[in-house]
Amino acid sequence: METVLQVLLGILGFQAAWVSSQELEQSPQSLIVQEGKNLTINCTSSKTLYGLYWYKQKYGEGLIFLMMLQKGGEEKSHEKITAKLDEKKQQSSLHITASQPSHAGIYLCGAD
C-alpha cells in the first residue's frame, strides 16, 4: 500500500517597518503527494524580495525554520529539500525530492 502525504501550504508574512503591505502568494495552496514522488511549492511576492524564509510545521507542533535565501539565484538544500530564490521573478521555489512521511506538514514562506 502506498503512503499518501498531505502537504498544506500557508503564507507567513514578515513586516519590517519600512515594508508596507508585502503580499505573498503560495502555490499550489494544498497538495497530496504519494510517498517517493517529487513536489514543488512556489512563493511569489508583490514587491522586491530582500530575504525569503521557508518554514515547516508538523501537525500539533511549532514552526521549524528550514532555510533563508537572500541573493538572487541562491540555492540551498537540506534533507531532500531544495529552495531557490529568483529575484527577477520575485519568487522562490521549494522542491522536495522523493517525498517521505517525515515531509508531511504545513509549509510556509515569509519575506522581508
Swiss-Prot record:
Ig-like domain mapped to chain residues: 22-112
Localization in the cell: Cell membrane
Gene3D superfamilies referenced in this protein's UniProt entry, alphabetically: Immunoglobulins
Gene Ontology cellular-component annotations: T cell receptor complex
Leader peptide range in chain numbering: 1-21
Carbohydrate-modified residues: N38, N42
Disulphide bridges: C43-C109
Source superkingdom: Eukaryota
Subunit structure: Alpha-beta TR is a heterodimer composed of an alpha and beta chain; disulfide-linked. The alpha-beta TR is associated with the transmembrane signaling CD3 coreceptor proteins to form the TR-CD3 (TcR or TCR). The assembly of alpha-beta TR heterodimers with CD3 occurs in the endoplasmic reticulum where a single alpha-beta TR heterodimer associates with one CD3D-CD3E heterodimer, one CD3G-CD3E heterodimer and one CD247 homodimer forming a stable octameric structure. CD3D-CD3E and CD3G-CD3E heterodimers preferentially associate with TR alpha and TR beta chains, respectively.
Protein name: T cell receptor alpha variable 34
Species this protein is from: Homo sapiens
Lineage of the species this protein comes from: Eukaryota, Metazoa, Chordata, Craniata, Vertebrata
